[in-house]
Design a protein with these regions (language model features):
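Asp-based, Mg2+/Mn2+-dependent phosphohydrolase catalytic module
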Residues: 1-5, 18, 40, 84, ...
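N-terminal helical cap/lid subdomain that shapes the substrate entry/recognition surface
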Residues: 2-103
Length: 229
């Protein structure tokens, strides 16, 4: 019997790619105006800083810290690190301003809660910005619990994050469904952790559903995919 449904956040409950694209454009323009670094060069520096941070931290939640990433970038570029907080502010403010719930998101959450199920978030990110996103999206009142990779000390598709989701839901993994847009990180990770896996694949074209994974094209299809509850 299904008792809880857990959702990935970025790319599942809102269009992360679209919001990120606008935020990245704003950040690139800011960096060019303040530091004279062209967008192409900034993109290369950003990729290098991301790689450096991942090597230094060995994974973990620090890789999601944009303030830290911009600090590393500025240090490598020989620029004042004092600009890092402003860079982070530009990025996050723009992303939040452009974050809009995907069609069916609010209705799906509300219907699940009305059916007596617990609703949670399972995300590879830090708690501070995920709470900010949920608040901006107007979804906070519909969420019972959240597990971030920061809290779990593990990133999807590692089992630990899914196990902690089930623990917070107060039920066994087999009594949980996990919904996400990443086949490997969300769907296969959840399936391998013993949960019902639902892959939100919004791309057009035929999709071969892996064994043990349900596929939906929109969150409007979720209630049917989960029935019978």
């Amino acid at each position: 019997m299904l008792k809880a449904v857990i959702f990935d956040l970025d790319g599942t409950l809102y269009d992360y790619d679209a919001a990120h694209a606008v935020a990245w454009e704003a950040l690139s323009a800011f960096v060019e105006s303040r530091l004279g670094i062209a967008p192409e060069r900034f993109a290369a520096l950003h990729a290098e800083a991301d790689g450096t941070l991942r090597r230094r931290c060995g994974g973990g939640s620090a890789i999601h810290n944009r303030l830290l990433r911009y600090q590393v970038l500025l240090e490598a570029a020989g620029k004042p690190i004092a600009l890092a907080p402003a860079m982070a502010e530009v990025y996050w403010t723009t992303l939040l301003d452009n974050a809009i719930p995907l069609p069916g998101a609010m209705d799906a959450l509300a219907r699940l809660r009305a059916a007596g199920l617990r609703v949670g978030i399972g995300t590879n990110m830090t708690a501070d910005w995920q709470f900010a996103k949920l608040e901006r999206l107007g979804l906070t009142p519909l969420i019972d619990f959240m597990v971030t990779s920061e809290e779990a000390g593990a990133e999807k598709p590692e089992a630990r994050l899914f196990e902690l989701c089930a623990e917070k839901a107060g039920c066994a993994p087999g009594e949980c469904a996990f919904v996400g847009d990443s086949l490997k990180g969300d769907a296969l990770g959840a399936r391998d952790a013993g949960m019902r896996a639902v892959w939100l694949c919004r791309k057009s074209g035929a999709t071969q559903a892996p064994e043990g994974v349900a596929v939906i094209r929109s969150l409007n299809e979720l209630p049917k995919s989960l029935s019978p509850l």
